[in-house]
Each structure stands twice: as C-alpha cells, then as structure tokens.
Amino acid sequence: MNLRDKLDVYMRLARMDRPIGTLLLLWPCLMALTFAAGGLPDLKVFIIFVIGVFSMRACGCIINDYADRKLDAHVERTKGRPLASGEVSSKEALLLFVVMALFSFGLVLMLNPLVVQLSVIGIILTIIYPFTKRYTNMPQMFLGTVWSWSIPMAYAAQTGTVPVEAWWLFAANWCWTVAYDTMYAMVDRDDDLKVGIKSTAILFGRYDRQIIGLFQLAALSCFIIAGMVADRGAIYAVGILAFIGFGLYQQKLINGRERAPCFTAFLNNNWAGMVLFTALMLDYLVLG
C-alpha cells in the first residue's frame, strides 16, 4: 500500500470522509460559545473549538473502531471499516488515536486551566464510551454525556466559569443526542442482536418511537429554557419552531423502523442543529 492509499485509509478510520458526526458535535458547541459570549465568541476560542471538534471526533471514531474491531465485521453497515476489513492494524489505530488526542490536548493548552481540567475528563469519557455497548443497554445515554461535554468547556473557555445556564444547554443536547443516536441504532438493531451489542434501540423495543419522542420533547423544552434564560427573542423562536418541524419529520421517517428511513432520520438532525444554531446567532446579531 503506497502513502496515498495509507492516508486514505487513515482518513476513513477517522471518518473524515463522513462529517455527519462532526457536524452533530459542532452545532451545540457553537451554540454554547454563542450563548456564553452573548453573541459573537472570541475568535481565538472559536477557531480552537472548531478544530478541536474535528480532532476529537476523529479520536472518538478511532477508539470506537478499535473497541469494535472484532464485532464490526459481522454488522452490515460497519464491515467495510478499515480495522474490521484489515486495511489498518490495531497498533496503527492506537498510534493514530494517541497522535490525535495529543493534538487535541495541545489545542486546549492555549486556553485557561479550567478548560484543560475539563478536557481531561472529556478524553476519559471518549475512551470509555465504546466499551459501554458491552455492559449496558444505554450506551446512547453515555454518548449523550460525551457529545455534550464540549458545552461546559465552551462556557469555561469564553467566560472562565461554567454557570448554571450552561447545564440547560447540556441537558438539551444530552436528550437530543439520545434521541438521534437511538435512530442510528435502529439501523443496526438486527445485526446488534446477533453479535451481542447493546443499545437503547434494543432496550426500548416496540416503544422506541414513543421514547425517542419523549427525548425529543425534553430536548426541545431545555433548548427553550436555555433561550429564555439568555433572554432570546423572535428569531430564536423561529429556530425552535423549525426544530419541532424536523423532529416531526424524523418521527414520520422512523415509523416503519426500516434501515434506510431510520438512517435518513438520523442524518436529518444535522439540519435541525444547523438551523437552530443559525437562528440563535441571527437573534443575537439582529436583536442584540
């Protein structure tokens, strides 16, 4: 394998070719920076967090594939991943993980000590998450914590503290993550049952749509409260209405519990996050 092919394999291992996860991680992070700054965030902090989202998502994907390398070969959607297919060795994957983790840690060293302390917790959570699928039926809930950890970090970077209002946004994103990652798990449910991988899609069973709906409603409520605490106005309210519309569309897609529509519903959450963040930013810029 030549250098170009090897780099292509590493890019796929880090999911650089599939940015959906990065975007789902990015929107709440940018919302946190915007709420914390009361508008446009500090440029240095903004750049560090955008780069950090990409690098930490890569870390998460690599350690996830390392943990699942023997199981992924038996799952239709994941059998072509570089570790499962043998295109890259376990040692190479671990080395790439360490490099990306050190790069990410180097980024936060340019910020204040509180952010550095929170980042250590973040990397530990990232390492633990892939293994939760073996021991609990609720790995999506653990992922919600991992996926939301950038929110207190963003507040800490922008303000030097993590105020109470940060946790409303944390709760909103936690519930939202559980909802959309359960949609994602519905795609793999049949394969996961065969190989022993646990998920909320399996745990919720025939009540999956209803429970996803409850998490969507809880996320919506917390996003509304976060906006009220920050005294947001009509433009943010329009974003909230759009978020409701996206949620209803996703419920329609997962109604039949078929793989392709469930995956489409998962992907649709990127648009929901982008629209809500855009509405928040415009609300600050236009209404002050």
From Swiss-Prot:
Per UniProt, the enzyme's principal EC class comes to transferase
Write down the chemical reaction(s) this protein catalyses: all-trans-octaprenyl diphosphate + 4-hydroxybenzoate = 4-hydroxy-3-(all-trans-octaprenyl)benzoate + diphosphate
- Among the record's GO biological process terms, what is one? ubiquinone biosynthetic process
Enzyme Commission (EC) number: 2.5.1.39
Q: Which Gene Ontology MF annotations are present?
A: 4-hydroxybenzoate polyprenyltransferase activity
The question of whether Membrane is a record keyword is answered with yes
**Mind telling me which GO cellular component terms the entry cites?**
plasma membrane
How does the UniProt record describe the way this protein sits in the membrane? Multi-pass membrane protein
Keywords assigned: Cell inner membrane, Cell membrane, Magnesium, Membrane, Transferase, Transmembrane, Transmembrane helix, Ubiquinone biosynthesis
Annotated localization = Cell inner membrane
**What is the top-level taxon of the source organism?**
Bacteria
Principal localisation: membrane
Q: Where are the transmembrane segments?
A: 20-40, 43-63, 96-116, 210-230, 234-254, 262-282
Give cofactor(s), names only: Mg(2+)
**Biological or metabolic pathway of the protein:** Cofactor biosynthesis; ubiquinone biosynthesis
Described by its record, this protein's role is as follows: Catalyzes the prenylation of para-hydroxybenzoate (PHB) with an all-trans polyprenyl group. Mediates the second step in the final reaction sequence of ubiquinone-8 (UQ-8) biosynthesis, which is the condensation of the polyisoprenoid side chain with PHB, generating the first membrane-bound Q intermediate 3-octaprenyl-4-hydroxybenzoate.
**UniProt similarity note:** Belongs to the UbiA prenyltransferase family.
Kindly give the NCBIfam families that the UniProt entry links to this protein: ubiA_proteo (TIGR01474)
Protein name as it appears in the record: 4-hydroxybenzoate octaprenyltransferase
- State the organism named in the record: Shewanella pealeana (strain ATCC 700345 / ANG-SQ1)
Gene that this sequence comes from: ubiA
